[in-house]
């Protein structure tokens, strides 16, 4: 229990190889993750801004004839 088995060493070596093996591997992985998160946030902004624009356009129009007449009088 005190010493690590061979499978533990394989996992540790795999993590070390991922972190330090090759120039810029970790930074490219993190950069790709950041790009994915940014694209997701931009997609949410686009979706919510188009919904807000649709709601503003709909609310700007009078809903009934009485509201239309009130707007004409003022």
Curated annotation (Swiss-Prot):
Residues 51-74 are annotated as: Disordered. GO terms for molecular function: protein transmembrane transporter activity. The keyword Protein transport applies. Keywords: Cell inner membrane, Cell membrane, Membrane, Protein transport, Translocation, Transmembrane, Transmembrane helix, Transport. GO terms for cellular component: TAT protein transport complex. It comes from the Bacteria. One of its GO terms (biological process) is protein transport by the Tat complex. The keyword Phosphoprotein does not apply. Residues 64-74 have a biased composition (Basic and acidic residues). The chain crosses the membrane at residues 1-21. It is a single-pass membrane protein. Gene3D superfamilies: 1.20.5.3310. Its main location: membrane. Part of the twin-arginine translocation (Tat) system that transports large folded proteins containing a characteristic twin-arginine motif in their signal peptide across membranes. TatA could form the protein-conducting channel of the Tat system. PANTHER family: SEC-INDEPENDENT PROTEIN TRANSLOCASE PROTEIN TATA. Belongs to the TatA/E family. The Tat system comprises two distinct complexes: a TatABC complex, containing multiple copies of TatA, TatB and TatC subunits, and a separate TatA complex, containing only TatA subunits. Substrates initially bind to the TatABC complex, which probably triggers association of the separate TatA complex to form the active translocon. This is Sec-independent protein translocase protein TatA. It comes from Caulobacter vibrioides (strain NA1000 / CB15N) (Caulobacter crescentus).
């Amino acid at each position: 229990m005190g010493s690590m088995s061979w499978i533990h060493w394989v996992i540790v070596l795999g993590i070390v190889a991922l972190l330090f093996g090759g120039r810029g591997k970790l930074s490219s992985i993190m950069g790709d993750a950041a790009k994915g998160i940014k694209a997701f946030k931009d997609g949410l902004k686009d979706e919510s801004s188009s919904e807000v624009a649709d709601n503003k356009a709909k609310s700007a129009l009078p809903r009934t004839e009485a509201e239309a007449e009130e707007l004409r009088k003022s």
